[in-house]
Structures are given as structure tokens and as C-alpha cells.
Amino acid sequence: MTVWLRFQPISGFRASMQVIRGKFSARADPGEVSSFQALATELSGTVGLGNIAGVAVAVSLGGPGAALWIAAFGVLGMSMKMAEATLGSKFREIREDGSIQGGPMVYLRDGLASIGYRRLGVVLGSAYAVFTVLGAFGADLFQTNQVAAIVADSSGSEFLQGNTWLLGAVIAALVGIAIFGGVTSIARWTSRIMPAMAIVYMLCVFAVIVVNLDNVPAALGAMVEGVFTGEGIAGGVVGVAIVGIQRALFSNGAGVGTAGMAHSASKTKHPATEGLTAMWEPLIDSVVVCMLTAIAIVVTGKHLAGSGENTEGVQLTASAFSTVADWFPLLLTLAVALFGYSTLLAYAYYGEQALTYLFGYKKSIIYTFRVLGIVGAVIGSAASLDAVIAFGDASFFLMAVPNILGIYFLAKVVRLEIFGFNRRLCAGSIEAVEDEDLRVGLVSEDPTPEQTQRAEKEERAEKERLRTLHRTLWDDPHFPVRAAHHGDDLASPMGTPDEPIPDTGQFLAVEERRSEGDGGAGSGPAGGGSHRAD
């Protein structure tokens, strides 16, 4: 996907910064949250205990080299996240009340139907929704297990260490307060928690590295050497790679599809903007946070005492933090609590989206799921680490299978959407929302009636401009008409000048095709090239 999108995570850096600031989104645009809030929600589900406990598990099982595999998978995962978020925004459903239904289950069903694979889309979409419910419980169990473990350990109370379910009950109550407020409530909580927990945790990690600064060169050398040698229970390069990729998948979620759900709720008219936003998630998660966590563990040498099978996850990271001061693991406890809490909120939303897809929006089903999630938090706090990791890995793998298969078939749609947006942006046909009262910004707010009227007026003017462009192109005898090949991503379904206006990106894509000549017919991952109709 990285090659197919021509390294967009690198070339799209400037545009992504503008998108995150809400420069191209108006408050009256369809959606519920800003692009930044969607980014914070997804990061809350990825930058969490997968970075703290997951990296500790990876280093214990596969040695220091597993950390570099996590980082490598994170870089490659940027394009996968772009694809998921773009498709999630493109094929979302907007209900009458303005709420959003989106995610892989929707783009698998509707996206595959649009290219002639309707039955396959229905099967994959339904399967993904079922697996997402399992994945939500898997995340629930893992997060509460590790939060309860480190809180009990930090307290020094033998009573709490023997009754971690009590801590699980407290966590469950706090989660219940937030999730019964819906997606906007979740977005508000995560967008506030995310910066605070990131700052606290990163400062702690830097402190550990500075205290053990003399060991940094040796630690980096061990990581590079460990990429190809491996050690312990998962010895060998294949074993190290598997462990690293497993933990990266559990950590950054690239390929799992959750980005499609988080970004489907964003206020935007351009699906590609969400791809440009989501691409940062694996970079922040796997390359920055995971790598720094791994370095902090390796420089202290605490991983050498792990036997692999009996690894304690987050407690290994806490042991590394104790090299700074005896009280320092308390700061990690605070960060873990915030990480785990925000992740629980994010996956509660994902599970509800899946259930809504399967059964429609029925309060009885949604409330039952929320109650079961709260009960699951209590169960997870008392379960063994090995059990919750096994369940979480299995559920995430099941989610990834239909999602990655669907993205393979929809690869052309993704490229057309992203390239079309870039061309329109360069051509000036996508204008920034300069009025601060109309722009979404970092945090979404509902528009006033006056703002809605102004936005609708601008939208009517834009539609008229596109209609004029449509008629002009229709009158051009050299411009291609209806595609001869169903699902062709480079031909424009022009129809007649009175039909609905096609996506401007299709016009620009055809111009790209024409400029490349007849020999420029592309062939994507899912099939053959384009054909022009006479």
C-alpha cells in the first residue's frame, strides 16, 4: 500500500498539518467531531498499554530487536491507516439526526458493492462487525488487567494485589460515566486526556533514558543486532519478526480497521482529509512511543531477567522506571491509568458501531453491550496476563483478515480519492475555510443557525461552479464519457449534463491519464487497467 500510494505519508506532510488544524472543514459539514478529535480518539485506542505493556512483552519474548520490527511495521502501517480512514469517510452513512454510521463494515459492504462484489462485501462487512465486538472485549480485558496490576503493585497493599477485581470495579464505574454520553462525550474526554497522558509518559521515559545515558549506545547496538539474531523463547529472526509485528498490530492497529470508524465521524466533505490525518497514528504510536519505551527498558537491563513465558508486562516497564527513583513508578501508574481509560472509551465506541451495523441502532442492545463491557472490565482485572493477551491477539487477527482483504480490492478507490484531493488542492479548487467562525478547528462545535446559512450559501455556489465545469467538459468532444470497464478508477462516468455532478477528482484523474498517454493504463492490486469509450 505504501508503494501503491506513492509514499503519500511523506509527500502529504504539509497538507496533513493543515487538515489537522481544521483548515478545510466547516462546522456545518456532515459529521460529529473534528479531524483532530478523531485523531485523538484513534490514538487513545492505539497509544496505550500496547506501548507500555505490549513493548515490554515483545522485548521479553523476542529480545531488543523486536522493538525495531515494531517501528518498521509502524512506518509501513501509515499508508494502511490512510486507506482505512479515507474509505471510512467516503462510504459512511449519515442518519437523519446527523449521527454517523461508518467503519470497515460499511466500506466493505458498500465499497465492494460499488466495484461489483456485492455478496463478498456483505459477508466481509458482517464478519468484521462480529469480530469487532470480540475485539472490543479483548481490549477491555487487556487494559483493565494491566491498569489494575500496576495500581495494585504501586500501592504495596497485599489486599489489593489479591483482590484486583475491586480496582476493576472502580475502572468500570469511571468508564460507564463516559460511554453513556455517546461518541461526542468520548471525543471530548479523549481529546482532553490524550495530550496530558502523552506529556506525562514521554517525560518519564526521557528521564529513564537520561539517568541511564551511558548505556544508550550498547542498548541501540543490542536492538540492531537483535533484529537478525533473536533470543529466548522466540529465538531466530522469524520469531523476532513475528513477536514484533504481533505487538505492533496490537499497539498501532494498522490493518485492524478501527481508524475507519474513528474518522468516519469527522466533519469533512473530502474523505482524503481523514487519510491525511490518520497516517500520523502509527508513526506516533510505533516509531516514537514504542521505540522510546523499548530503549528505556533495554538501557536499564531489566529485560534480561524476564524468562519470556512469565513476563509481567507493564510491571517490567515499572521496574525500568524505578532506576530513576523509588517513587518514579508512581508517575508510570498515573500514565497507565490515563492510557488504559482512554483506550477503553475508544473501543467502547468501536463496539457500538459494530453492533449498530448488525442490528440497527437499538438502545436495548447498545445498553446491554455497555453493561457487558463494564462487567468485562471487572473480569479482566482478575484474569491472568497470558489469557488476556491470547484473547486480544486472536480477536485483533480476526478483525484484520476481512479488513485487509477488502482494502486490497478497494486499493484503486483509495488512490483515486487521495490523488484527486491532492490535485484539486494544488489546482486551487479546494479552498480553505478562512472564516474562523465557520472553520471547525481542533475541537468541533455545533454551528449556529447563521453559520449554517452561510455554509449552505457557499455550498450552493460551489455546486454551481462544478455544474458549469461539468457542462463545459460535456461539450468537449475529446473528453471521455461513460467508462467501458465497470469499476475503472481512471474513467469518468459522465452520463448526461443533467445527471448528478461527478466527483471533480474523476475529471482530474482522467486528465492525468490523458497526459500519460495511451500506454499509461495502470493496473492496481485488484485488477486491470482502464479503457476509454468512443
Feature annotation, model-predicted:
Residues 1, 5-17, 124, 132, ...:
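Membrane-interface loop-to-helix entry segments
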Residues 84-96, 205-222, 235, 265-266, ...:
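Extracellular/periplasmic helix-exit of transmembrane alpha-helices
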Residues 8-34, 57, 63-67, 81-119, ...:
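Flexible loop linkers connecting adjacent transmembrane helices
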Residues 429-534:
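Long, low-complexity, intrinsically disordered cytosolic termini of multi-pass membrane proteins
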Residues 1-15, 60-98, 285-292, 328-331, ...:
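Extracellular loop-to-transmembrane helix junctions
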Residues 1-2, 44, 76-98, 109-145, ...:
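Helix-loop-helix module between adjacent transmembrane segments
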Residues 1-49, 59-66, 77, 408-436, ...:
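N-terminal alpha-helical transmembrane segments of multi-pass membrane transport
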Residues 28-61, 87-91, 96-111, 123, ...:
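Alpha-helical membrane segments and immediately flanking helix-loop junctions
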